[in-house]
């Protein structure tokens, strides 16, 4: 079952990536058992929100506004939701990488991560400098500097009130 908050956040993803992101969200979510649901905690982030996160303590990002793939709608961060009392409310949000709520002997986080990686998503868990397990991105081979330069030069599309680089 889809998480409405996640579906709304996917609508803010880069238009070129939106359909893939939705399809892969549903594919990953379908691998989770009853009582577990995948949520995207972030998809698109404005530069001002990015700066706020950058200045937060403890440190949660190395990227200032404009320096994150999130700022271009090409990334998402995940969190797993658990319905501990089986009433459909999913009262626990978790970043646990070991919990196996559906008792299939594979950690729920691993099931989701393995699926996204199999679909071509880069995972922040594999980074060497700033390891970021909840982060996934599909950047079409562009780094943030190139994406920012496109926006700065007006090579853009605007949709839903959000400006994205043309890619």
Predicted feature residues:
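Cell-envelope/glycan interface and biosynthesis
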Residues: 1-143, 147, 160-161, 166
């Amino acid at each position: 079952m889809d998480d409405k908050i996640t579906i709304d956040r996917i609508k803010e993803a880069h238009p070129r990536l939106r359909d893939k992101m939705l399809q892969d969200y549903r594919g990953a979510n379908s691998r989770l058992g009853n009582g577990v649901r995948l949520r995207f905690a972030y998809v698109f982030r404005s530069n001002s929100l990015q700066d706020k996160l950058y200045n937060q303590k403890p440190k949660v990002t190395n990227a200032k506004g404009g320096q994150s793939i999130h700022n271009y709608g090409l990334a998402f961060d995940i969190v797993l939701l658990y319905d501990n009392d089986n009433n459909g409310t999913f009262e626990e949000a978790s970043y646990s990488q070991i919990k196996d709520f559906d008792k299939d002997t594979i950690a729920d986080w691993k099931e989701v991560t393995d699926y996204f990686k199999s679909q071509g998503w880069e995972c922040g868990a594999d980074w060497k400098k700033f390891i970021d397990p909840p982060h996934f991105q599909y950047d079409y081979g562009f780094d943030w500097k190139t994406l920012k330069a496109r926006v700065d030069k007006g090579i853009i599309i605007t949709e839903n009130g959000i400006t994205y680089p043309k890619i």
